[in-house]
Amino acid sequence: MVPGRLWRRGVLAVAAVGALLFVWWFVTTPPALPTREGHVTAVTTVGKPVFVGVWSTGSDFGRELHVAGVRLRADATVAVDLEPLLCRGGSVGVTSDPAPFCRELLDPAGTTLGPGDSLVVRVVAEEPGAVYLDRPSLAFREGPRWGNREAGTEAVLAIVTP
């Protein structure tokens, strides 16, 4: 083998590995989703679900996310049921009935989230207590890119006796 050819092959191999690493990085690191400081505050009674809006995309949201799932993490003083929901075509602050605010209320896994949609968490507990809900983490694909990103805001809830 001629030394020039060996050197050229080495450079090509390094360039190919570098290109593959760049493509892997690009595909697995989509841009961050909007987050907000502070938190949403809600109060509900034992056994009564409350719907808390934790992220609203707004009509100027220029992205379309194909949602694979939503992960919720909460610290609570009592057992609590949490269910992420996609509010299609609307947004919710805090309510016991999201129907007037959402065109559709769906399981976000397998749906597309776009402008004017929002993420809502249904919270219900069978005992009085407190819940601190972290920002939701969305697993999504956007074009060729996919990843997990936090979005929206945190929530603090009080569950009281009726």
Locations of regions flagged by a protein language model:
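Non-catalytic macromolecular-recognition regions in eukaryotic signaling proteins
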Residues: 2-162
